[in-house]
Amino acid sequence: MNFSALRRNLLVGSLSLALSAGLLGQAVAGEQLQKIKDAGEIKIGLEGTYPPFSFVDESGKLTGFEVEFSEALAKELGVKVKLQTTPWAGILAALESKRLDAVVNQVTISEERKKKYDFSEPYTVSGIQALVLTKKADELNIKKAADLDGKKVGVGLGTNYEQWVKAEVPGAQVKTYDDDPTKFQDLRVGRIDTILIDRLAALEYAKKAKDTTVTSEAFSRQESGIALRKGEPELLAAVNKAIEKLRADGTLKKLSEKYFSADVTQ
């Protein structure tokens, strides 16, 4: 075989391999959505300790805005929902390891996170909020981000709140937490001065816990979306279509007003 013939055969072989790889890629891309449909359920991760988004009520039932949103989402996808309560520190790792199909847990959409995960269109809009004990509000006088300088600030480990305060207020004394109950307990006993959480959660918490109050307007706008693994475009498209349907038929707004007495979905 001469060199030209050999080169031609190699080229044909390479093109065949590329075509096969492309077809395989298309098959894999749609595989997860089909797996979910075949199983008849979608595994969604949330904390279950983050009222009013997800929490256990007095009867022992898991409920909340994101619980009902997940149920409605699954219904639009034509499957049942399997809710798996998972601590925040490990919830995205559970998604990566395929123990979860999606995370619905106020995951803020950021450029850094978009490098690792795909996100649905936003389903809530909020901001970073400081929460303090009411009796210390005047003394702490937190009105803007710079006022956190020198303060003992509690944040969830690995959250956008941790990233934000370390970047924007390097003089803050940041303490990280794996769970919310410990964080709020430390606020009450004085181990920290303030907590940074989602504005919507802060307003709801302060409404129920009269010894706490929000200190100012939100420090920054943030949008939350459903986190999915990279490389599942058909699942992402199906999720976005479901969200658009829930927005159009008023379901999202209805759930928002039920838990927040306002439309926080846009």
How should each PLM-predicted stretch be described?
Residues 68-76, 136, 152, 156-160, ...:
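Extended ligand-binding regions for polar small-molecule ligands
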Residues 67, 83-93, 140, 175-185, ...:
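Short helix-initiation/N-cap motifs at beta->coil->alpha
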Residues 31-106, 249:
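Extracytoplasmic small-molecule ligand-binding "clamshell" domains
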Residues 71, 75, 80-147, 213, ...:
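Acidic, polar ligand-binding/catalytic clefts
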Residues 125-132, 199, 203-244, 260-266:
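Periplasmic-binding protein-like
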